[in-house]
Amino acid sequence: MTDHTKEHENTPSMGFLDGLVNSISQQPKAIEEEIKFDGALPVLPLRNTVLFPDVIVPIGVARQRSIALLESLAPNSPVVFLMQTDADIDAPTPDELHKNGSVGLVLRTLRMPDNSMSVIVQGVKRVVVEAFTQTEPYLAAKVTPKDEEELEGVEFDAYARTTKQLASKIIELSPNSPNEASYAIQSIENTRFLIHFIASNISVPAAEKQKMIEAEGMKARAERLIHFLNREVQVLELSKQIQTKVKTDMDRSQREFILRQQLKTIQQELGEQDAQMQDVEKLREAVEKKNLPEEVTSVVSKEIDKLSRIPQASPDYSVTRNYVDTILALPWGHFSETVINLHEAEKILNQDHYGLGKVKDRILEYLAVLKLKSNMKAPILCFCGPPGVGKTSLGRSIARALGRKFIRISLGGVRDEAEIRGHRRTYIGSMPGRIIQGIKTAGTSNPVFMLDEIDKIGADFRGNPSSALLEVLDPAQNNAFSDHYLEIPYDLSKVMFIATANTLDPIPVPLRDRMEIINLSGYTEYEKLHIAERYLIPRQLEEHGIRPEDVSFDALTTKKIINAYTREAGVRNLERQIANVCRVIAKDIVIRRESDQPDETPITVVTADLKKYLGMEQFYPDVSEPVMLSGVAVGLAWTPVGGDILFIESTVMKGTGRLILTGQLGDVMKESAQAALSYLKSCADYFKIPDEAFRYWDVHVHVPQGAIPKDGPSAGVTILTSLASIYTQRKVKPCIAMTGEITLRGRILPVGGIKEKVLAAKRAGITEILLPEKNEKDVKEALETNGGAFSDVSFKYFHEMDDLIDYVLEPAENGAPQFKVEDKDHTPETTGNESE
């Protein structure tokens, strides 16, 4: 329904404009006719309008039912005016009208060109509806008038005076209000009319006016009116203060602008405008064109003013000029438009990377939330995984999926805090930190910012860069990042920071706590094969100028390269080996084309040709061949570059019960060996180990590859198995590897890096893996995403160490071990192996 079909409230605001002056000064005369309330009176619903007694107001009428009511009335007929509870209702029922209103007289009606009517009504008395008697053709109701008390005494005089003062103040503060209105207000002697008239014209919501007419007693209505008048005075005074301040600031700016233009014109006329002043003017123009924050504008304007007073030959000139140029070069308030299309983003992520489902899901979740709430803070992610799994390239793909700029800085070897926060301008050659420089390079305030190798940050006497990153990577603080060079807060809250690390251990706990860690595991053989066929081989063929139709790689050949020429968690060395093959092929193609009889036959790389392309095999899958000696167990280890297998060797010799540990072991690993030996001693009867074995025989535990430092609790199970094997003279079953932490009670605790360890075991030819019972969930998760890669590996889970030893050790060949003492010097002998 269009607007012209509704009643329009035509009540003037508290400005008391020109047309009302006469109405105010002419107070209404007493109604001579007596309104009879013994019968039903017609009811006219009003939208957002309240009729007060004694007040004359114009009302627009457009509804047919209301027009029918007005046409049926005789001159000066009484009508009950009730406001609707909901102004949007076109045909209100009795339940949709307020029960309190006013009875008034229709003084005049006027038909409008659009067939609506304009009526002039005068309120007479407040009434309350007792019951509605009809609804068609218009509403009618039986009403009861409300008696008004006599307004006498000092108290009502005070109410009247206060009301007049506030009304006059509002007229004084209101723009375009005639001065006569204030005089007319002061001349009103009837307190009831004064209160009702001002209440009718004050600019407050209609619901508040309805509460005012429902209030019992003039005192209550007067107090409510004074409350609204006070509020209006406060609003107008505050508005005036704001306008005065704005006008003063504008006058100052205009005066400064005019003076500068005059100075510029005078200098041009005199030919005195030098290059320095031209530079200063260009800087001022640049400040005016850029949408800088108020604080930044104030600082840079002061620096430009200082620049205009510094001689160009002074060293301070270049320092100040560089500072101003840096501020103007930053993208204050400029953001790249992010066009969010989840299907397109998912397509881009899948085009660039194979697998990595968790990471892709996290990015798509962020995009979905960003589409629902555009002002959300960007996440702080940390990709943790071995080298070569695609952490850095994944950041580029994320930027492409978001449609944003990509900035990368390497933090490896950074030791100076100023690299992050910048140098203060007091130093010679000072400059912003690498964060602000990256934002400047990006040219936008919401790039994808990669902090590469965050785990390789150092620290020295110049400070700890990790501490400076705490503010950068804290969403609650980085909206006002303070660079030492700028000394002005810069908003980094819309920047999507992505950190990369090979391991989390070197990262300080407070910094780690600010990031959402996403672990990227090493690739399985199946994943590497797909990555090679889909990404690496096509890329290397293109980089070496070889057409795809000229060369093809057999799948078995690619698998052979993966298993025999690389041993890594990622695919970086795999790409190098493929590049080596492509170089040899490129040489062959060129030689064939330069020969007398060019040969364009496509080349197929098969397994038999790998020796020609890459030389002898570098790795063998049977590295964990069966060991025929007791005291040797195979463990699983996690390293920053992926998983690996670990041999634990033990032997006994004549001695005094010492434990000898070699192989460059860390403190945690040494403690695991001590705990394993203590557990064996406590369970010697169960494993049928004589007491003499611990008193008169030394045991030596060695971990090969002694040049490599080793540490961690996950070798505890393997060390205990090795010790149990040498003391019981029972061999470990072949093709079994294990991992887990042990306690003195013989419990097996869960460890991390399960997927990497399982991949290492599979590469080494292990067919059965023993794991802590609580790591079963990790294996299930790995099987869900890479089930085919572990099809030929079985898993067993243990909670107690004695159960594991009973399972993994074969029966003793010569019965129980014998540790004898032949003489009083305790010279022992054993039927087992003294060394390996």
Curated annotation (Swiss-Prot):
One Pfam family it belongs to: Lon_C
Gene3D superfamilies: 1.10.8.60, 1.20.5.5270, 1.20.58.1480, 3.30.230.10, LON domain-like, P-loop containing nucleotide triphosphate hydrolases
EC code: 3.4.21.53
Main localization of the protein described in the UniProt heading: cytoplasm
Listed InterPro entries: AAA+_ATPase, ATPase_AAA_core, Lon_bac, Lon_bac/euk-typ, Lon_lid, Lon_proteolytic, Lon_Prtase, Lon_prtase_N
All copies of domain Lon proteolytic, residue ranges: 627-811
Annotated region described as Disordered, given as residue ranges: 816-836
Main function: ATP-dependent serine protease that mediates the selective degradation of mutant and abnormal proteins as well as certain short-lived regulatory proteins. Required for cellular homeostasis and for survival from DNA damage and developmental changes induced by stress. Degrades polypeptides processively to yield small peptide fragments that are 5 to 10 amino acids long. Binds to DNA in a double-stranded, site-specific manner.
Protein name in the entry: Lon protease
Species: Chloroherpeton thalassium (strain ATCC 35110 / GB-78)
